[in-house]
Amino acid sequence: MASNMDREMILADFQACTGIENIDEAITLLEQNNWDLVAAINGVIPQENGILQSDFGGETMPGPTFDPASHPAPASTPSSSAFRPVMPSRQIVERQPRMLDFRVEYRDRNVDVVLEDSCTVGEIKQILENELQIPVPKMLLKGWKTGDVEDSTVLKSLHLPKNNSLYVLTPDLPPPSSSSHAGALQESLNQNFMLIITHREVQREYNLNFSGSSTVQEVKRNVYDLTSIPVRHQLWEGWPASATDDSMCLAESGLSYPCHRLTVGRRTSPVQTREQSEEQSTDVHMVSDSDGDDFEDASEFGVDDGEVFGMASSTLRKSPMMPENAENEGDALLQFTAEFSSRYGDCHPVFFIGSLEAAFQEAFYVKARDRKLLAIYLHHDESVLTNVFCSQMLCAESIVSYLSQNFITWAWDLTKDTNRARFLTMCNRHFGSVIAQTIRTQKTDQFPLFLIIMGKRSSNEVLNVIQGNTTVDELMMRLMAAMEIFSAQQQEDIKDEDEREARENVKREQDEAYRLSLEADRAKREAHEREMAEQFRLEQIRKEQEEEREAIRLSLEQALPPEPKEENAEPVSKLRIRTPSGEFLERRFLASNKLQIVFDFVASKGFPWDEFKLLSTFPRRDVTQLDPNKSLLEVNLFPQETLFLQAKE
């Protein structure tokens, strides 16, 4: 592993040999070749007749190349170059064409383009015109690290790496008006947009996460809470032209996904605006005076490795990534996100704002179908790998997109000892002493770390610990490998959850059926009890009525005069009375007896005269309609008569 001083000299020699001025790109190429200067130069400038020879030994290729044996390398000094065989490389008169790979994204399509670095940007657009059927004048090709470029720009002048990612914008073309637009809008409503909002007056950035269903008005109100600038005094830059109404939801406003940069300031008077412009111009002039000597004076003024190997466009760090002894993890992560954006740009993973326990809840303690992996990014400012890892790997569009879709990303800064100790305590509590000891023993140059956590039924499992000395492809491969393991476990969890839910549904249905059965039985029992009570009541009434009738019958029977004999001195009338059942009642009465006595006799036999009537046949008449005080002789029921009992209607 080369020392920091050696790396400074290797970096300077590499830029001098290749002409690459972009420090980030140069560091990336050297990292890919493990800081082997010769291998890195050969990767950028391949030769026809052989490769450059290192003064550290190795096989010598034939040809008029430099002979290291005849020129021994002197001992390295702080002012000497770590790479001596540079000049002989110019003796090679011709270089092989360098091929560049481009992956261009347009809406839901990816187009792969392979061109020589001697081609122009316009040739890429011509290929895309055939593939995407988009006219070149309507096409904006974005994603260049150097900013917007002209169509006539030669690719070689951009000093691009071998693999590049670009995207196409077509602001002058109308969006597709097919039926899929509604589905795309619905999908956008469910997406989360990261708005990177710069407060112009204080030069501070806020990373705010909003759902697609949030409105522009809600964004402005949240910014008011952060900046104390009332909505009516907010002056915005960066909103799409389609965002003309504050009631419009973010999914319809045309924001870039997953990140979009905005700038907000306070509306001021013309005098204040002119004064601020003069101050800003002065500040810019002062900064530009010192920019040219930053790199040359780095070692002289004791600038640390992180600043030497940092992004070319970044300035000196004004604040730490995370405050020391932060009591609230959410506030600490807000500062971390803002500082991360200011250092590495607005396209970065969406860091979860909240405690580690809250991140667990968001990732693991939901329905199996909604669970995600948890990615924990551990930052360290004193590591030489940090800036390259953040700017080239962690902020790569492919990594950002994959993390936002499949992971909950949580971050912590281990630069300060207090924050490091606090995280180790959390790590020991949630992941066990083994993982805590692994992180504790990591050296500074092995940071940053990327932990991939999968939630299980009773514990949290660390699937992978990714160190900072990696590449975008390797990082993506390890993320995808973790995702495969998680997907297999997720399918099992979904199956178990569905089975458990099915069992619970069956149990609920059984409980409901049992409850309904109990209610039906109770209702039936209550109805039966009511019926029995009604029957008992009616039976009691019937018995009382029968007893009453029996008492009346007995009293009438006792009140009847004795039946006269056939040989009585007084005239006797013999009556035969046929009952409804066909039986006959026979009795003798004195002809002088009143008709009421006959009625009482019939009633004493169970046929009360108010329910039955007596009928005679010749002549046919209703005897019960006659005057009961008349004698039998007076009503012609003498000497004998046959009568019929008939129930009254």
Curated annotation (Swiss-Prot):
<dbReference type="GO" id="GO:1990917">
    <property type="term" value="C:ooplasm"/>
</dbReference>
<dbReference type="GO" id="GO:0043130">
    <property type="term" value="F:ubiquitin binding"/>
</dbReference>
<dbReference type="GO" id="GO:0019901">
    <property type="term" value="F:protein kinase binding"/>
</dbReference>
<dbReference type="GO" id="GO:0030155">
    <property type="term" value="P:regulation of cell adhesion"/>
</dbReference>
<dbReference type="GO" id="GO:0045740">
    <property type="term" value="P:positive regulation of DNA replication"/>
</dbReference>
<feature type="modified residue" description="Phosphoserine">
    <location>
        <position position="581"/>
    </location>
</feature>
<dbReference type="InterPro" id="IPR044541">
    <property type="entry name" value="FAF1_UBA"/>
</dbReference>
<dbReference type="GO" id="GO:0005737">
    <property type="term" value="C:cytoplasm"/>
</dbReference>
<keyword id="KW-0053">Apoptosis</keyword>
<dbReference type="InterPro" id="IPR050730">
    <property type="entry name" value="UBX_domain-protein"/>
</dbReference>
<feature type="domain" description="UBA">
    <location>
        <begin position="1"/>
        <end position="57"/>
    </location>
</feature>
<dbReference type="GO" id="GO:0043124">
    <property type="term" value="P:negative regulation of canonical NF-kappaB signal transduction"/>
</dbReference>
<dbReference type="InterPro" id="IPR049483">
    <property type="entry name" value="FAF1_2-like_UAS"/>
</dbReference>
<keyword id="KW-0539">Nucleus</keyword>
<dbReference type="GO" id="GO:0031625">
    <property type="term" value="F:ubiquitin protein ligase binding"/>
</dbReference>
<dbReference type="Pfam" id="PF14555">
    <property type="entry name" value="UBA_4"/>
</dbReference>
<feature type="modified residue" description="Phosphoserine">
    <location>
        <position position="319"/>
    </location>
</feature>
<feature type="domain" description="UBX">
    <location>
        <begin position="568"/>
        <end position="645"/>
    </location>
</feature>
<dbReference type="Pfam" id="PF00789">
    <property type="entry name" value="UBX"/>
</dbReference>
<dbReference type="InterPro" id="IPR006577">
    <property type="entry name" value="UAS"/>
</dbReference>
<dbReference type="GO" id="GO:0036337">
    <property type="term" value="P:Fas signaling pathway"/>
</dbReference>
<dbReference type="GO" id="GO:1902043">
    <property type="term" value="P:positive regulation of extrinsic apoptotic signaling pathway via death domain receptors"/>
</dbReference>
<protein>
    <recommendedName>
        <fullName>FAS-associated factor 1</fullName>
    </recommendedName>
</protein>
<dbReference type="InterPro" id="IPR029071">
    <property type="entry name" value="Ubiquitin-like_domsf"/>
</dbReference>
<feature type="modified residue" description="Phosphothreonine">
    <location>
        <position position="579"/>
    </location>
</feature>
<feature type="compositionally biased region" description="Low complexity">
    <location>
        <begin position="68"/>
        <end position="82"/>
    </location>
</feature>
<dbReference type="GO" id="GO:0005635">
    <property type="term" value="C:nuclear envelope"/>
</dbReference>
<comment type="function">
    <text>Ubiquitin-binding protein. Required for the progression of DNA replication forks by targeting DNA replication licensing factor CDT1 for degradation. Potentiates but cannot initiate FAS-induced apoptosis.</text>
</comment>
<feature type="region of interest" description="Disordered">
    <location>
        <begin position="266"/>
        <end position="290"/>
    </location>
</feature>
<dbReference type="GO" id="GO:0045732">
    <property type="term" value="P:positive regulation of protein catabolic process"/>
</dbReference>
<dbReference type="GO" id="GO:0042176">
    <property type="term" value="P:regulation of protein catabolic process"/>
</dbReference>
<dbReference type="GO" id="GO:0034098">
    <property type="term" value="C:VCP-NPL4-UFD1 AAA ATPase complex"/>
</dbReference>
<dbReference type="GO" id="GO:0005634">
    <property type="term" value="C:nucleus"/>
</dbReference>
<dbReference type="InterPro" id="IPR033043">
    <property type="entry name" value="FAF1-like_UBX"/>
</dbReference>
<dbReference type="GO" id="GO:0005654">
    <property type="term" value="C:nucleoplasm"/>
</dbReference>
<dbReference type="GO" id="GO:0019904">
    <property type="term" value="F:protein domain specific binding"/>
</dbReference>
<dbReference type="InterPro" id="IPR001012">
    <property type="entry name" value="UBX_dom"/>
</dbReference>
<dbReference type="GO" id="GO:0048471">
    <property type="term" value="C:perinuclear region of cytoplasm"/>
</dbReference>
<comment type="subunit">
    <text>Interacts with CDT1 and ATPase VCP/p97. Interacts (via UBA domain) with FAS (via death domain). Interacts (via UBA domain) with NLRP12 (via DAPIN/PYRIN domain).</text>
</comment>
<keyword id="KW-0597">Phosphoprotein</keyword>
<dbReference type="GO" id="GO:0051059">
    <property type="term" value="F:NF-kappaB binding"/>
</dbReference>
<feature type="region of interest" description="Disordered">
    <location>
        <begin position="56"/>
        <end position="84"/>
    </location>
</feature>
